[in-house]
Amino acid sequence: MFEKIEELEVRYHELESLLADPAVLGNQPEFRRLSREHNDLTPLIESYRTYKKVLEEMEGNRELLADPEMKEMAQAELEELEQRQEELEGEIKLLLLPRDPNDDRNVILEIRAGTGGDESALFAGDLFRMYSRFAERNRWKVEVMSASESERGGFKEIVALIEGQGVFAKLKYESGTHRVQRVPETEAQGRIHTSACTVAVLPEAEDIEVDINPADLKIDVYRASGAGGQHVNKTESAVRITHIPTGIVVECQDERSQIKNRAKAMKVLKTKILDGLHQEQNARIAADRKQQVGSGDRSERIRTYNFPQGRMTDHRIGLTLYRLDSLMEGDIAEVVDALRTHYQMEALKAQAEAA
């Protein structure tokens, strides 16, 4: 393990020299690429340097054990340092895990109402609000790409672009079926109804990754409509694009300009095509190792929101929190962090078994 880190530390020094080179500074794409690599290595190198310092201090304390006057103090410090050594080793193992190349990407967030009719659409709106508030807390930008509103509020479907640092890393485990249990406002008997929404979190595709043949596209334009189906625009500004080879259909009517709607729809289409390729690749990997860790399977029921009990339960990790009000206001960092830790531990376990 440490031989590999020594090699990475040599590379880290190389990167520091390259980033100070005027030739690299003048080449912005190369500068950004090297900066990303440098930033990715920084936490590991800093932890390793701290680890080496702790080992040196431990050696010094062991030498002091021979001194009767210093023995007690040296022993106490040694015990603290041994604990710190263990913590750092765990930290370094996590940092050495293969990094998801999509972690730093923006995401396309899709929320679709499922079983439950109007109540499901209302819950889709609640989920979008929850993620929007979480984005605000992280200083991310949220841009609605397309939305199909329900007559009684909420959304039949909403698609949004979320831009910022580490968005996919934090949101990727939100993909799946979210179930809600609550009493609808129209329920006179006070009975609890169960409905569900599906959430998909897709890493935004870069133009260079997806090459689309214009001949493979069917583009329709139409007048944008509101929640009740009425036309809200006199011009045909809404755009529907069908990718014929895959059958993927995307729509955008959020902007008044057809050109802007088309650009947004193409961005979503490229992301969906790339996601399809990733899903195929993940399925092949899963077939090889018999299971898929943290795959974000959208058919999986991942979470239940029980409003009468004020409870949220994540079924994958058995986490239950009784503060539903604050969670729905975007205070979901505890859940996000718990999921990331869980899947990191699973990856470590799989790595140890494979070794």
Swiss-Prot record:
UniProt entry keywords in alphabetical sequence: Cytoplasm, Methylation, Protein biosynthesis
Biological source species: Geobacter sulfurreducens (strain ATCC 51573 / DSM 12127 / PCA)
PANTHER family linked: LD18447P (PTHR43804:SF7)
GO molecular function: translation release factor activity, codon specific
Annotated positions of the N5-methylglutamine modification: 230
Summary of the function given for this chain in its UniProt record: Peptide chain release factor 1 directs the termination of translation in response to the peptide chain termination codons UAG and UAA.
Primary location recorded for the protein, binned into one broad class: cytoplasm
Protein name: Peptide chain release factor 1
SUPFAM superfamilies reported in the protein's UniProt record: Release factor
